[in-house]
């Protein structure tokens, strides 16, 4: 009888020990769904200089899994943001504090390595996480699927989830230096800086004990596509930061200060895009494997975690629709189509907002430069409402209890937005156009001074 039960056990093979991959492993573990994680690297949590922002839409899912408290202990809530411009003008906003008050989850930043450590250390059965296994082949076998690794190992299951990122013909218009620095006098924990330059931006988050997480995004000379996108070395990161060392990002803090105090830094090309195909037979992809975005709005990891919540919920529902038999390939395909139908538009909306954010922050046109400098601070209410409305529509795992914080947060009046990112910004652009209509000379003057 035990052998019969084992024969009918549905198994998920997760390719990639990423944040998305390990979060899915935790979700499946909570549902008692058999699974393994195959990771190509020798260790799950290497220090690569990257960091992530955790927003309420990602935090609520990690909280459902019992992981958020460990993460929160390593962070300082962001409560205030400062924005600065090339002409030394600046202003501040308490939008992060408002988000914290609304959702009971703050915006926080921490090392990607630390997030992976928390996910790994809190995972209940580490024998399910297999490292040093680079996938070389995927086989579809009709009633099952197999993953073959470079050393000849074969792992057989019923569903393969790609959570390790892929290289494909996505566009590359920006390069980014990610860095983590020691405390810098003048940068206070719980604050965050956006410096909008011409064709570049510098964004910092100041975490627990003064640890500074930062990135510099530089617009490239042209649009590239993989595999022709530039590749960068540590020397390239040093060269870019050296050229920008005197750029003042806030008060008397410069890019040079970030670089001199760095603990680790790396440089990479930023791929942007969202795929139309999310699954094939028994194979499905999520997170960075299906949508890639710039870090400007801090939603890359959070969007991946939402993918996990929806996919795990659907897998669990499908399996329990018939407890005696494994789901057929047809059932699996139907489930994966539903996964895409539920996640495609939200992910696309986030991708579009991220894409716009990169171009807005780097002032890649004179109109964006003018709106950022002269209009942006006066439409804070619009930005706040749009942000809260978007976050309030975040997905959760449907077979786990909703966190208590969600029930006490004041977000019930906000429903998932049906508007596109372009429509969400209509008021911003209308305000800007009105400015030029009332002051016709302003457009030509600013165009000549900014260009």
UniProtKB/Swiss-Prot annotation:
**Record: residues binding FAD:** 39, 53, 112, 288, 301
Spell out where the chain is glycosylated: 385
From the record, give the transmembrane residue ranges.
426-446
GO terms of molecular function: FAD binding; monooxygenase activity
| BP GO terms, sorted | terpenoid biosynthetic process
Q: Give, as in the UniProt entry, the pathway in which the protein acts.
A: Secondary metabolite biosynthesis; terpenoid biosynthesis
Source organism superkingdom: Eukaryota
Active site location: 196
Q: Which Pfam families match?
A: FAD_binding_3
UniProt keywords (A-Z) are: FAD, Flavoprotein, Glycoprotein, Membrane, Monooxygenase, Oxidoreductase, Transmembrane, Transmembrane helix
Q: Which InterPro entries match?
A: FAD-bd, FAD/NAD-bd_sf, FAD_mOase_fung
Cellular component terms per the entry's GO annotation: membrane
- List its EC numbers: 1.-.-.-
Catalytic EC class:
oxidoreductase
Query: Where is this gene product found?
Result: Membrane
Q: Which cofactor does it need?
A: FAD
Topologically, how does it sit relative to the membrane? Answer: Single-pass membrane protein
Function text: FAD-dependent monooxygenase; part of the gene cluster that mediates the biosynthesis of andrastins, meroterpenoid compounds that exhibit inhibitory activity against ras farnesyltransferase, suggesting that they could be promising leads for antitumor agents. The first step of the pathway is the synthesis of 3,5-dimethylorsellinic acid (DMOA) by the polyketide synthase adrD via condensation of one acetyl-CoA starter unit with 3 malonyl-CoA units and 2 methylations. DMAO is then converted to farnesyl-DMAO by the prenyltransferase adrG.
Q: Which family does it belong to?
A: Belongs to the paxM FAD-dependent monooxygenase family.
| Name of this chain's protein | FAD-dependent monooxygenase adrH
Q: Which gene encodes it?
A: adrH
